[in-house]
Amino acid sequence: MTGYTPDEKLRLQQLRELRRRWLKDQELSPREPVLPPQKMGPMEKFWNKFLENKSPWRKMVHGVYQKSIFVFTHVLVPVWIIHYYMKYHVSEKPYGIVEKKSRIFPGDTILETGEVIPPMKEFPDQHH
């Protein structure tokens, strides 16, 4: 027994018809695609309204605005970030390394004040 049974033939025919309909549904009409209207932010609305009159000075003002935004985002902000990192993470922390003070003996002079350390008092009743 070779070939398809009547049930299998019917199923294959229905699948082919379904595929044909699906492919036909994928074709776009001339009105498609329908895109939603773009919502503009307040700055974009302002600049579109400002640039409707195409005078040269308006274009120059817009160019200066765009360049200032570029400088702010690509120069100033990175410099601030690098400065913050260098200030708080790379530089040595104050008092991070503690050095022992040198010993002071009688007769030594303290450099900051010029004070001379007096000789130690002798206590005859104590041995050392």
UniProtKB/Swiss-Prot annotation:
Membrane topology: Single-pass membrane protein
Subcellular locations according to the entry: Mitochondrion inner membrane
Keywords from the UniProt entry: Acetylation, Electron transport, Membrane, Mitochondrion, Mitochondrion inner membrane, Respiratory chain, Transmembrane, Transmembrane helix, Transport
Coiled coil regions in record: none
Gene Ontology BP term (one): mitochondrial electron transport, NADH to ubiquinone
Main location: mitochondrion
InterPro entries according to UniProt: NADH_DH_b-subcmplx_su6
N6-acetyllysine, modified sites: 24
TM segment ranges: 68-86
Modified sites of kind N-acetylthreonine: 2
Entry-linked Pfam families: NDUF_B6
Superkingdom of this protein's organism: Eukaryota
Gene Ontology annotations for the cellular component aspect, listed alphabetically: mitochondrial inner membrane; respiratory chain complex I
Subunit structure: Complex I is composed of 45 different subunits.
PANTHER family cross-referenced by the UniProt entry: NADH DEHYDROGENASE [UBIQUINONE] 1 BETA SUBCOMPLEX SUBUNIT 6
Functional summary from the UniProt entry: Accessory subunit of the mitochondrial membrane respiratory chain NADH dehydrogenase (Complex I), that is believed not to be involved in catalysis. Complex I functions in the transfer of electrons from NADH to the respiratory chain. The immediate electron acceptor for the enzyme is believed to be ubiquinone.
Recorded family membership: Belongs to the complex I NDUFB6 subunit family.
Protein name stated in the entry: NADH dehydrogenase [ubiquinone] 1 beta subcomplex subunit 6
